[in-house]
């Protein structure tokens, strides 16, 4: 994946009085355009688990009036999207080091009202919730994204906010 943004989030000895049953890590993504001409404006997106065992995922592309959805690689879940001939792909966080143990994470796609998404085709904005179980004091997350701007909120702390300009008419906001 090139170019890419890799980040590590660590919360160490956060003052939690007792073990939590569940904690949620929420990320938001949206494509925004001022272009209204459908011949010029083309948006596609794809979310889900991939089954390929090869490396690296490929994002979808748009151009010439048609769109291709983002694709995954490496056998993990992820999401991708494209605007005209620009595309991005991100892998969902699947595992985290929680209280010195590697644990699996459940990923849920939500709409802007924080309800689970039933129809991805009509959503322009998507929230991804990574749900952790039985957290006590230490949390370490590592994830790689391709050409993404990331806004991450972990229950109490806003951690990352970046903005990337794709071209004069398009930008991606995470």
Swiss-Prot record:
Task: Give the originating organism.
Answer: Dictyostelium discoideum
What is the recorded name of this protein?
Putative uncharacterized protein DDB_G0287183
